Regions:
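Structural motif marking the loop-to-transmembrane transition
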Residues: 8-10, 126
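Hydrophobic membrane-insertion alpha-helices, especially the h-region
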Residues: 11-27
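Catalytic glycan-binding domains that act on GlcNAc-containing polysaccharides
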Residues: 24-198, 207
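A juxtamembrane structural motif centered on a specific transmembrane helix
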Residues: 203-205
Length: 207
């Protein structure tokens, strides 16, 4: 049954790729690691809001180092460091529930929606979206207006706030590192799938 074998091979490949991605998120070379729950929430919400999982993971790593209970000096809370007033607005706009922001099941969907909102607002410009995530939409809108930044702005050094410069730079760097490592894991999953199917075919007897 060639069709059935082909379909089984595809399902097995997809399963292996997903499994490798989860393992990669959990075990990548870093001083910080997400919990299994956070790793799963990254994948679910990246798919839900059409974000690269590497981008969502990079934002969480830079914002909180995966510390679900983190509270900053300005009152930003949880894995994605959401200010409660902003989180309430996000909940109202997105339809996601508002609750304990130290709960990643509440925090990450809100933060992921907001990240997608900012990417759309700035017409896909990741530098501007990340700058707004860190410094606020009002500041970024002011900079765009006063400094005549173009839609394809990418001069991170021109961002007035050093903290925001650092945030944007780190997120983009970590995202690219994660993407490269994920591609390696994906290739290994495909190779394992081919090897597994070949092994199965060898041991299949034709009656």
């Amino acid at each position: 049954m060639p069709r059935r074998k082909s379909r089984s091979k595809k399902i097995f490949t997809v399963f292996l790729a997903a499994l490798c991605l989860v393992c990669f998120i959990l075990l990548r070379a870093s001083d910080y690691h997400p919990s299994a729950q956070v790793a799963q929430l990254i994948l679910i919400n990246a798919e839900r809001y059409k974000l690269q999982p590497e981008l969502l993971q990079a934002v969480i790593e830079v914002e909180s180092k995966y510390d679900e209970k983190a509270v900053s000096h300005v009152g930003a809370v949880g894995a994605m460091q959401l200010v409660p007033t902003t989180a309430r607005w996000i909940a109202q706009e997105s339809g996601n529930p508002y609750g304990d922001l130290k709960d990643p099941a509440i925090n990450i969907p809100l933060g992921a929606w907001y990240l997608r909102y900012l990417i759309n607002k700035y017409h896909g410009n990741l530098e501007l979206a990340l700058a707004a995530y860190n410094a606020g939409r009002g500041n970024v809108d002011t900079w765009i207006r006063e400094k005549n930044w173009p839609d394809d702005f990418n001069d991170i050094d021109a961002i007035p706030f050093p903290e925001t410069q650092g945030f944007v730079t780190q997120v983009i760097r970590i995202k690219e590192e994660l993407k490269k490592k994920h591609e390696i894991q994906k290739l290994k999953a495909q190779q394992a799938s081919v090897a597994q199917v070949g092994h199965t075919d060898k041991n299949t007897k034709v009656g």
